């Protein structure tokens, strides 16, 4: 039986740090389901269809990565995709409080699904979607080293029109 993990996020946009985390999680699990959240209540740079499409493009050559969008409870989506674990990244101690609360709630909702925390590779520890968006607003050309090429193309399209 395959060990499947789900990696949820808004991914607005997906960064090289996210990609690194998926690739490293594949050393532990047979399959990773990248679950793109509808980001209820958030103003996003890209709508969910574009975010999902970019992530599919990033992992198009990896049969062990599946990309889905979801709304509602993460644990329900995990069950739907036969995931035994939720993968989350922890960049800094400041991430821990929120992630610990989410992990605890998910465990209360479904104790069969474990949360696995991975720290980023050092070169990606300061990259976040929020920071990529903040830099892109001022100079989109400066974010090319932080995101996959297909994501940079979308950022360029969005900001070169403004």
Swiss-Prot record:
Belongs to the bacterial CoaD family. Keywords: ATP-binding, Coenzyme A biosynthesis, Cytoplasm, Magnesium, Nucleotide-binding, Nucleotidyltransferase, Transferase. The record marks 18 as: Transition state stabilizer. Pfam families: CTP_transf_like. Pathway: Cofactor biosynthesis; coenzyme A biosynthesis; CoA from (R)-pantothenate: step 4/5. It is an enzyme of class 2 (transferase). It catalyses: (R)-4'-phosphopantetheine + ATP + H(+) = 3'-dephospho-CoA + diphosphate. Reversibly transfers an adenylyl group from ATP to 4'-phosphopantetheine, yielding dephospho-CoA (dPCoA) and pyrophosphate. This is Phosphopantetheine adenylyltransferase. GO terms for biological process: coenzyme A biosynthetic process. Its main location: cytoplasm. It comes from the Bacteria.
């Amino acid at each position: 039986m395959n060990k499947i993990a789900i990696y949820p996020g808004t991914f607005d946009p997906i960064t090289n740090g996210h990609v690194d985390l998926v690739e490293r999680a594949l050393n532990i699990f047979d399959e990773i389901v990248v679950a793109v959240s509808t980001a209820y209540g958030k103003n996003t740079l890209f709508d969910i269809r574009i975010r999902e499409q970019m992530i599919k493009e990033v992992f198009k050559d990896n049969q062990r990565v599946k990309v889905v969008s979801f709304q509602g409870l993460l644990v329900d989506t995990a069950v739907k995709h036969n995931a035994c674990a939720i993968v989350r990244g922890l960049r800094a101690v400041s991430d821990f409080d929120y992630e610990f609360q989410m992990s605890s709630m998910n465990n209360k909702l479904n104790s069969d699904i474990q949360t696995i925390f991975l720290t980023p590779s050092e070169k990606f520890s300061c990259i976040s979607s929020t920071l990529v968006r903040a830099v892109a607003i001022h100079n989109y050309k400066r974010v090319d080293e932080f995101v996959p090429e297909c994501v940079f193309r979308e950022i360029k399209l969005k900001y070169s029109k403004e």
